[in-house]
C-alpha cells in the first residue's frame, strides 16, 4: 500500500502543475512536451489502478516483508505469481538471494521483483496463433527416360599385372633338395631305378619330378571406374 499511496500523492501534484503552467508561445510548448507526456502516463496509471477490483487485489500482489535475519547463511528462492486484475493479468517474478562470506563474514542480500501486465487476449482476434499445416515431404522427381532407348553410359577399367612373388628360392648347386632326409631317400631310389632303365634314358636327361620348380601363374588386377553418363 505504500507504493500506491506514493502514486496517489503524485497524481494531484501533476494535475496542479499542469494547470498552473502558462503556455505563451511555441517555444514554451516544446519545453513542456516532456512534462505533458509524464502527465498522460500518470493519468493512464490512475485509470488502471483507481478501480475497486484492482485495489482489492493490489495488497495481495505485494508479498509481506521478509525477515532476512532468520534466513540461513546461503539462501536462494524464486517465486512466480499471476493475479487477475479486472481484464488484465498481472505476472510477477520474485527472486531472493543471500550469500555469506565464510572468511570475512560479509552478508550480501538481494531481492529482485519483475512485474508485467498483460491484457486479456481474444482467442479469435489478433492473438490467434496461425496453424501450421503439415506438408508432405517433397518426392524427388525421377528423370523420365525411354525404356527402349537407355541413356548411353561410358564404362572404363584398368588392367594391371601383379608382380610375381617367389614362393621358393632358386635351387643352387643343383643339390639343395638333398638337405632333407626324404630327398636323400628319393635320390637313392631314383639312382636304383636309373641303373635298370639306363638303356631307355640314353636319348634324354632324367630330371627328378620333385626337383622341378612349381609353375608360376600370372595375376592381373582389374580396376573398374564408375560409369559416366554421356
From Swiss-Prot:
N-glycosylated during spermatogenesis. Not N-glycosylated in mature sperm. Testis-specific. Abundant in the seminiferous tubules where it is associated with developing spermatocytes. Expressed only in testis (at protein level). Not detectable on postnatal days 4 and 9 but after day 18 it gradually increased as the development of testes progressed. Expressed at high levels in testis and at weak levels in epididymis. Residues 1-20 form the signal peptide. One of its GO terms (cellular component) is extracellular region. It is found in: Secreted; Cytoplasmic vesicle, Secretory vesicle, Acrosome. Keywords: Cytoplasmic vesicle, Glycoprotein, Secreted, Signal. Disruption phenotype: Nullizygous embryos Dkkl1 mice develop into viable, fertile adults. Glycans are attached at residues 31, 87, 102. It comes from the Eukaryota. GO terms for biological process: canonical Wnt signaling pathway; negative regulation of testosterone biosynthetic process; penetration of zona pellucida; positive regulation of apoptotic process; positive regulation of fat cell differentiation. Involved in fertilization by facilitating sperm penetration of the zona pellucida. May promote spermatocyte apoptosis, thereby limiting sperm production. In adults, may reduce testosterone synthesis in Leydig cells. Is not essential either for development or fertility. Contains a N-terminal domain similar to that of the N-terminal section of DKK3. This is Dickkopf-like protein 1. It comes from Mus musculus.
Amino acid at each position: 500500500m505504500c507504493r500506491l499511496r506514493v502514486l496517489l500523492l503524485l497524481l494531484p501534484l501533476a494535475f496542479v502543475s499542469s494547470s498552473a503552467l502558462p503556455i505563451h508561445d511555441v517555444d514554451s510548448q516544446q519545453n513542456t512536451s516532456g512534462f505533458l507526456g509524464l502527465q498522460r502516463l500518470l493519468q493512464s496509471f490512475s485509470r488502471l489502478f483507481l478501480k475497486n477490483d484492482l485495489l482489492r487485489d493490489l495488497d495481495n500482489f505485494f508479498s509481506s516483508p521478509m525477515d532476512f535475519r532468520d534466513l540461513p547463511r546461503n539462501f536462494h528462492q524464486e517465486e512466480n505469481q499471476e493475479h487477475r486484475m479486472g481484464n488484465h493479468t498481472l505476472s510477477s517474478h520474485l527472486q531472493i538471494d543471500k550469500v555469506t562470506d565464510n572468511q570475512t563474514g560479509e552478508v550480501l542480500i538481494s531481492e529482485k521483483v519483475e512485474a508485467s501486465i498483460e491484457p486479456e487476449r481474444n482467442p479469435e482476434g489478433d492473438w490467434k496463433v496461425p496453424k501450421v499445416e503439415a506438408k508432405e515431404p517433397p518426392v524427388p522427381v525421377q528423370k523420365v527416360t525411354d525404356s527402349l532407348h537407355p541413356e548411353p553410359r561410358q564404362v572404363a577399367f584398368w588392367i594391371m599385372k601383379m608382380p610375381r612373388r617367389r614362393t621358393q628360392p632358386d635351387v643352387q648347386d643343383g643339390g639343395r633338395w638333398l638337405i632333407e632326409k626324404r630327398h636323400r631317400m628319393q635320390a637313392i631310389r631314383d639312382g636304383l631305378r636309373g641303373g635298370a632303365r639306363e638303356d631307355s634314358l640314353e636319348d634324354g636327361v632324367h630330371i627328378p619330378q620333385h626337383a622341378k620348380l612349381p609353375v608360376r601363374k600370372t595375376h592381373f588386377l582389374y580396376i573398374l571406374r564408375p560409369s559416366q553418363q554421356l
